[in-house]
């Protein structure tokens, strides 16, 4: 399978390229970056200390030529621009970008009628196993427990709460028969009054080089259950993304997530 990478000079892009080069059955066919990036024209493996024969380009059509799938961990506006070209060229997509609004998500769903797309807030196998644990816990602890979600990421992350934290909230809310849009509390300040027992709270930490920590707390009277996932590197995201790309090999179209990829549905 031929795979192109968006954001090729970024932290996640470099990790994806390294993982593809080390994985049998897949090859790097294209590397995309923003216009004006100092990496344009360089070999995609330069920062990894090796040659790939693939030059980083801002030309979407050139970067996607010969690609079966594009892996994209960029920003919503960039991903949507890539999506339009990928759809036209028939290139499938694995999307790990977070921060989409409802219109952006609708655009992904529409494009998935024509091409196969895996869209997931987190590609880690461990995180997706955590989602299943949360579903079970929420059903067992449906009454008498207050639910709070705490997430921490590096200082460079631009959206909050994280897409993974929001997905955790959606999993818990769905298991409880609630709508996260109406029960989520994203900030508390001043005299807030007593906690609404049906609410799901979020707390966000940003600092340093934290790759990604997530904890869901079920706080009852006399006990507290915490389900946590902590990432120590982006390797697990890269592994999951390449796994998702291979999953799409025989999928002509459709919108999938990592639960589909891992057979957890």
Curated annotation (Swiss-Prot):
(S)-2,3,4,5-tetrahydrodipicolinate binds at residues 154, 163-164. InterPro entries: DapB_C (IPR022663), DapB_N (IPR000846), DapB_N_CS (IPR022664), DHDPR_bac (IPR023940), NAD(P)-bd_dom_sf (IPR036291). Keywords: Amino-acid biosynthesis, Cytoplasm, Diaminopimelate biosynthesis, Lysine biosynthesis, NAD, NADP, Oxidoreductase. Its EC number is 1.17.1.8. It is an enzyme of class 1 (oxidoreductase). It catalyses: (S)-2,3,4,5-tetrahydrodipicolinate + NAD(+) + H2O = (2S,4S)-4-hydroxy-2,3,4,5-tetrahydrodipicolinate + NADH + H(+); (S)-2,3,4,5-tetrahydrodipicolinate + NADP(+) + H2O = (2S,4S)-4-hydroxy-2,3,4,5-tetrahydrodipicolinate + NADPH + H(+). GO terms for biological process: diaminopimelate biosynthetic process; lysine biosynthetic process via diaminopimelate. One of its GO terms (cellular component) is cytosol. NAD(+) binds at residues 7-12, 33, 96-98, 120-123. Signal peptide: none annotated. The active site is at 153 (proton donor/acceptor), 157 (proton donor). It is found in: Cytoplasm. Pathway: Amino-acid biosynthesis; L-lysine biosynthesis via DAP pathway; (S)-tetrahydrodipicolinate from L-aspartate: step 4/4. Belongs to the DapB family. This is 4-hydroxy-tetrahydrodipicolinate reductase. The lineage of its organism: Bacteria, Pseudomonadati, Pseudomonadota, Betaproteobacteria, Burkholderiales.
